[in-house]
């Protein structure tokens, strides 16, 4: 595969999953849903780019002598700003729908409501607190480990979202997920392999095989738990659920690394 094609696909993934102003090619529609079959493998690469920006802020803030907690907050804030809180919005909508709806149709209706409810607010708070706390804990052990873990988590968690979109059919016919379509089994597997490979290359040298297996294993558990829950409650997936999967898998990955990185 040519480098220009890879860069174009990563650019398409960044345009869709972030606020980074990546220009579209002459033959591309910058406002159309991406071709997931084509760019699925590039989604974890785009995630790594977003994580890299957060990691740079993390290392920079730590090098300036700021407290670990402040550095962790700035790193998470950077990732949130770069994505326009896309995944956080999905997590909040999913929590509101799954927690507040008594029927499939009511859950989907709540998930489309732009207002945030108590379940969504709690989910957002816990997501932000957990990511900040986990990065703070990793920073206390090693800034390098913390930075690499953030990049790997941002990459693998977005590959998990691709797997969800393939595992389940769209829950509604007129949502963003239905418009983008399913990536297809081959494309979803390629996305997962790229995410897992990046995570392995980043975490094994810095923290070890055990940390890598634990982090990936917890991410897989989070993915399958959300897949089963989404299928049971709404009969499929939506873009919001994919965002929730990204958030939960990122938390699970960071937690797995910290479990093995801390002194025993």
Swiss-Prot record:
Chief location of this protein within or outside the cell: membrane
Superkingdom of origin: Bacteria
Keywords: Cell inner membrane, Cell membrane, Cobalamin biosynthesis, Magnesium, Membrane, Transferase, Transmembrane, Transmembrane helix
Cofactor requirements of the protein: Mg(2+)
One GO location term (cellular component): plasma membrane
GO molecular function terms noted in the UniProt entry: adenosylcobinamide-GDP ribazoletransferase activity; cobalamin 5'-phosphate synthase activity
Sequence intervals crossing the membrane: 39-59, 63-83, 121-141, 148-168, 201-221, 241-261
InterPro entries hit by this protein: CobS
Residues annotated as signal peptide: none
Catalytic function, reaction form: alpha-ribazole + adenosylcob(III)inamide-GDP = adenosylcob(III)alamin + GMP + H(+); alpha-ribazole 5'-phosphate + adenosylcob(III)inamide-GDP = adenosylcob(III)alamin 5'-phosphate + GMP + H(+)
PANTHER family for this protein: ADENOSYLCOBINAMIDE-GDP RIBAZOLETRANSFERASE
A GO biological process held by the record: cobalamin biosynthetic process
Annotated protein name in UniProt: Adenosylcobinamide-GDP ribazoletransferase
General function of this protein: Joins adenosylcobinamide-GDP and alpha-ribazole to generate adenosylcobalamin (Ado-cobalamin). Also synthesizes adenosylcobalamin 5'-phosphate from adenosylcobinamide-GDP and alpha-ribazole 5'-phosphate.
């Amino acid at each position: 595969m040519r480098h220009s094609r890879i860069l174009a696909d990563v650019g398409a993934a960044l345009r869709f999953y972030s606020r980074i102003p990546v220009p579209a090619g002459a033959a591309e529609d910058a406002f159309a849903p991406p071709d997931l079959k084509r760019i699925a493998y590039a989604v974890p690469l785009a995630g790594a780019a977003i994580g890299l920006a957060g990691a740079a802020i993390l290392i920079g803030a730590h090098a300036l002598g700021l407290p670990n907690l402040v550095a962790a907050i700035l790193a998470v804030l950077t990732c949130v700003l770069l994505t326009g809180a896309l995944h956080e919005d999905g997590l909040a909508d999913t929590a509101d729908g799954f927690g507040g709806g008594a029927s499939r149709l009511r859950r989907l209706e709540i998930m489309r409501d732009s207002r945030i409810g108590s379940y969504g607010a709690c989910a957002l708070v816990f997501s932000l607190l957990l990511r900040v706390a986990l990065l703070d804990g990793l920073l206390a052990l090693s800034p390098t480990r913390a930075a690499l873990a953030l990049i790997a988590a941002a990459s693998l968690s977005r590959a998990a979202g691709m797997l969800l979109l393939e595992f389940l059919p769209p829950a509604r016919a007129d949502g963003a997920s239905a418009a983008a379509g399913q990536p297809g089994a081959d494309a979803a597997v390629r996305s997962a392999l790229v995410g897992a490979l990046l995570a392995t290359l980043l975490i094994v040298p810095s923290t070890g095989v055990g940390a890598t297996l634990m982090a990936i294993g917890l991410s897989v558990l989070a993915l399958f738990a959300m897949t089963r829950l989404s299928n049971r409650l709404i009969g499929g997936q939506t873009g919001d659920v994919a965002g929730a999967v990204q958030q939960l898998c990122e938390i699970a990955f960071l937690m797995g690394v910290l479990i093995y990185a801390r002194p025993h």
